[in-house]
Amino acid sequence: MLFFPKPRPPRPGALRAGLAALIMGAVVWPVIGAARPGAVPAPVPAPVPPLAVSLGDGLATRYAAARAEILAAVRTADRHGHHRRAAALRELAAPARRFLAFDGRDGGRAAEVFGDLPTARGIAVLVPGAGVDLDRYGPLRGGATRLRDALGDGSAVVAWLGYATPSSVSLQALTPARADAALPALRAFVRELRAARPAARIWLVCHSYGSVVCGRAAGGLDVAGVVLLGGPGAGVATAAALGPYAEVWAGRAAGDWVALLPHVSVELPFATVGLAADPVSPGFGARILDAGGGGHGDYLAAGSPALASVARIVAGAGDGDG
């Protein structure tokens, strides 16, 4: 009988070194097919008044205007043969859905509201990571819905798809370039929200590559705090860079593959490869929340410890494991 010894698991240092080599290989030999799919045509959206102007009786008008933009994008997508996109957009245009903004171009931009924005004492802005666009919007909406349910009355959640996310497996997901491009839009949105709701506690809840976006954008913003979930990096070196007064929390589930990524930054002539500090490392300085044992996509899953932790934090009750 032949005996095959059980292979020993690779040492963490060797695994990280190998992953670093893969990152470098991704720079030199880009993955075929990793480029973002061709943009689906969509009309240019009409300008909208500032949220502070719309927040009262005008909010329903702003929601209706965004719905009209979505329906216009449906017609354009159908006319150009993009029927999958058209079907996804029809779901977004349901009368019960409420969008502050919509732009169907370049993968799509949207800001959807869950809860009563004018009366909410606490507002969570949910910032997604790689691979999210109008065709793959469902997980973002689901997470926002569950977080709003966990927070209860007196709260609102905004699902903010306000930037061109990188593809899930791509060189773009290994550099801060997409996060830097998103920075002006996220800052402008949060400032508009703050002007409309000066007394509300506003939190950024950022998943995966969204942690890099929030890390780059949060400094100088008037927010109560930032929550980084499953972040492959924080975009900055320490939690202090996210603002002198903001609470900074981070969590990583026990089954999240992001833990295997090396946290290195390599300056090359044409790109910076790496996403800065590990958000859950002691040196970063964030408070650590209970993220449970799920995987990378499970942070806001129904019944998850991370969902309960985020709800407690945003509600101002902290987290038991912090």
Where are these regions (language model features)?
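Well-ordered beta-sheet/strand-loop patches within structured domains
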Residues: 186-188, 192, 208-209
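Structural motif
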Residues: 122-124, 201-203, 225
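Well-ordered alpha-helical segments embedded in enzymatic catalytic cores
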Residues: 3-6, 185-189
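Gly/Ala-rich beta-loop-alpha elbow adjacent to hydrolase catalytic centers
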Residues: 205-215
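Generic recognition of flexible, low-complexity loop/linker segments
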Residues: 110-114, 191, 214-216, 236-239
